Amino acid sequence: MIVLGIDPGYALMGWGVVESEGSRMKLINYGCIETKAGVPMQNRLRTLQLGVKDLLNIYRPDDVAFEELFFARNVTTALMVGAARGAAIIAAAEYTENLYEYTPMQIKQAITGYGKADKKQIQQMVKLLLKMDEIPKPDDAADAIACAITHCQAGVAKTQFLMK
């Protein structure tokens, strides 16, 4: 199974492609789709949407896993990231119905065994689980890889994480 993990973002949208076979996982590729500040919102969203479409066409994932948004304070940031997430979901929905979402706590629990793990712990475990030489950068890409790993580990229970 090939999974595209996405960490929604407006300036940087992290992505990671992980292939799993049984309990074995292999990192295929990762990176970020970047939008430039000062560009009109609709153009930035279009860049994100087209970027996700390109990833889907290149890697042909079986499933797409999104990290759910969690913002406690900044409403403006939440709205912008929500719009970016929407652009990515629309692109993915045109490709497949197999869209899943995981909360940050579920990802932390799956990756480290502790639902309140910090970023460094998650990054270190991503490196370990995928036998990488170094921690993936930037953080957005590492988060997307962690989301893909979480989905791979969900196994038959993954249906409970289908987007509704």
Q: Where are the predicted features?
A:
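Phosphate- and other anionic-substrate recognition elements at nucleic-acid/protein interfaces
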Residues: 1-164
